[in-house]
């Protein structure tokens, strides 16, 4: 199992909100305000990147999309409880 981890810095408020809504629609769970995670691989990573790229201003915004192994996620430490997307626990 692999995961897709996304972090972004989009300066425009309405575009940032659209980015959040799009990632949630795609099955991502919110980790922090602009950090999301989902079970998936390269195809999900590419799809999410393309969606965010359409919203971003290439001159000032930043997007980072990473495909990471499941054991890295299971071995991660966090504060604030489990990450839930409403249907399933993604990371505990």
From Swiss-Prot:
Enzyme Commission code(s) on record: 3.1.-.-
Entry's transmembrane regions: none
Broadest EC class assigned to this enzyme: hydrolase
InterPro entries listed in its UniProt record: CRISPR_associated_Cas2, Rhodanese-like_dom, Virulence_VapD/CRISPR_Cas2
Keywords for the protein's UniProt record, in alphabetical order: Antiviral defense, Endonuclease, Hydrolase, Magnesium, Metal-binding, Nuclease
GO molecular function, one term: metal ion binding
Gene3D superfamilies found in the cross-reference section: 3.30.70.240
Cofactor: Mg(2+)
HAMAP family hit by this protein: Cas2
Summary of subunit composition and partner proteins: Homodimer, forms a heterotetramer with a Cas1 homodimer.
Job description of the protein: CRISPR (clustered regularly interspaced short palindromic repeat), is an adaptive immune system that provides protection against mobile genetic elements (viruses, transposable elements and conjugative plasmids). CRISPR clusters contain sequences complementary to antecedent mobile elements and target invading nucleic acids. CRISPR clusters are transcribed and processed into CRISPR RNA (crRNA). Functions as a ssRNA-specific endoribonuclease. Involved in the integration of spacer DNA into the CRISPR cassette.
Protein name (Swiss-Prot/TrEMBL): CRISPR-associated endoribonuclease Cas2
Species this chain originates from: Aeropyrum pernix (strain ATCC 700893 / DSM 11879 / JCM 9820 / NBRC 100138 / K1)
């Amino acid at each position: 199992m692999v995961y897709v981890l996304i972090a972004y810095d989009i300066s425009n408020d309405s575009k940032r909100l659209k980015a959040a809504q799009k990632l949630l629609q795609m099955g991502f769970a919110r980790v922090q305000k602009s950090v999301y995670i989902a079970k998936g691989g390269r195809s999900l990573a590419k799809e999410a990147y393309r969606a965010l790229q359409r919203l971003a201003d290439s001159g000032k915004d930043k997007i980072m999309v990473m495909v990471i192994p499941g054991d890295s996620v299971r071995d991660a430490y966090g504060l604030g409880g489990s990450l839930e997307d409403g249907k399933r626990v993604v990371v505990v």
